[in-house]
Amino acid sequence: MRMLFLFSLLFFLFFHSSSSSRSSSESHIFIYGGCSPEKYTPNTPFESNRDTFLSSVVTSSSEASFNSFAVGNDSSSSSSSSSAAVFGLYQCREDLRHSDCSKCIQNSVDQITLLCPYSYGASLQLEGCFLRYETNDFLGRQDTSLRYKKCSTKSVENDYEFFKRRDDVLSDLESTQLGYKVSRSGLVEGYAQCVGDLSPSDCTACLAESVGKLKNLCGSAVAAEVYLAQCYAHYWGSGYYDFSSGRSMNSNSSLHNIFYRLPHMTEA
């Protein structure tokens, strides 16, 4: 009994320390990104509004893990001015401290301006945060389109215990209405999050779609992650998701290649 207690304590401490490491040092890891094909002309009202948006998200992220913005959206203004409006949001993983959230968002802003120069719309997902802006008002509108998925090359066959634990974790994640949730069953762990402007029912629906794609697209993979436009879900078998060295799911090390091969963002 004493040995069992010590093992459980060590497992808890390992999980806690791993999660803490993931919360800060891994938050900058690139997941996916996309740019709209339409480009704006430099030194125009849209560029000014976009720069205001990007400056606002950096300021806000030091105090809040989520916020949305509509810049230049004045219904009383001319049509040319309203077409220069920028709608956007940012979100950090809720387990990040405000200081780490701010660093992640600053990193996202730096990257998105380099990767999507003069784009009317752009989206960037890092391990710890998400940034998106468009000229169309997408805020609060449900979108479950698939943006990115990764399945481990290692799979599990005929392991009833693993699949039961995995399904327990996914069922728990799928039921959340709180925006962010961490779950564990036995040696299987996972977490999920919705964008902060979703209603509880839309969050649950988005996560149900994400979990369904995890099962359908990744099958018996020992670890997998699926990102939809407004939510994501991950799971992994303990010991496979190596927090100390980043993903162990054969992530492409080239930021440019990952970004370039993505399809254009869908426009509203």
Which residue ranges define each predicted feature?
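Extracellular secretory-pathway ectodomains and N-terminal mature segments of eukaryotic proteins
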Residues: 1-268
